[in-house]
């Protein structure tokens, strides 16, 4: 049996800190993966509007949001300016590719995409 591992990297912190760590872990285990990166602004803080959606608070309680994302990430696009992931982390993305992993685009603005994809028409 073969398994495929797809890693969505949606935040500035995830690109700068998480992706290189995952590369090291995967290389040590001779495992492959496809990394899909968000390339535009990290607007993670704008996800706060999801607090009004059913199930969101349950998810927040179940996962350690602050620990996983960090306070700065949770403020990007609201109280802190959104860093441009693609511009500031292009070298890291190339490093992931050069380490032998497949690299692709997940979204431009992950929060914008996630909040609009369900009601998008074909032209979108």
Question: Which positions does each model-derived feature cover?
Answer:
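Catalytic alpha-helical scaffold of carbohydrate-active enzymes acting on polysaccharides/glycoconjugates
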Residues: 1-124
């Amino acid at each position: 049996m073969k398994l495929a591992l797809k890693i969505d990297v949606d935040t500035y912190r995830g690109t700068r800190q998480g992706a290189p760590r995952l590369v090291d872990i995967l290389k040590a285990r001779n495992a492959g993966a496809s990394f899909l990166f968000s390339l535009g602004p990290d607007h993670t803080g704008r996800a706060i509007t999801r607090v009004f959606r059913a199930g969101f608070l349950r998810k927040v309680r179940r996962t350690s949001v602050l620990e996983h994302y960090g306070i700065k990430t949770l403020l990007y696009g609201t109280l802190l300016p959104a860093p441009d992931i693609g511009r500031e982390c292009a070298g890291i993305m190339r490093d992931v590719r050069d380490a032998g992993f497949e690299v692709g685009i997940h979204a431009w603005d992950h929060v914008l995409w996630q909040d609009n994809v369900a009601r998008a028409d074909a032209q979108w």
